[in-house]
Amino acid sequence: TFAIEGVSRSLLAQITRHRIASFSVQSQRYVAKDNFDYIIPPAIEAIPEAKKLFIEAMEHDRETYKKLGELLAASHEKELTEAGKDPKDAQKAAKKMANEDARYVLSNACDTKIVMTMNVRSLYNFFALRCCERAQWEIRALATEMLRLVKGVSPVLFKNAGPACVRGNCAEGGMSCGKAVQIREKFANL
């Protein structure tokens, strides 16, 4: 079981494609994201103008989320109060109702928290696919860190875990990164 924090909703979409795992994910419905953190991809981080534009977009999303939340909460609170709900309870319920729709403006870069459970066989499959150089950078970094952690707990069991090229030929065929020797060395020393 892994507790994963500081990853994007984009990573969440990828990792939940592994149906061989059990997931619990932080709710955007019940957890307000007024001051959400976000993940900046390294390629964007490396270009000052791109980074500036990205941060501006995230700040705009944050402000839009807050404003939508306020507008929706006020509307829901009024409806609930008029329907006879206690004002304090109406305010609390209205905020949660507002989050439901305001969250649609949030970017895939928005951070989230995940708890994931996988058995050893499933982990081997996950590592073979997601530690590969062809995997998207964020999930590759997560998979590599997860592998490092499990190797620390059970080095014999996970000795041969990693991308497919660690145990034999690259599974990517013509799309191979061409770095099998370096990859094997990297994962042998992980």
Predicted regions and their residues:
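Family-specific signature for flavin-dependent thymidylate synthase
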Residues: T1-L190
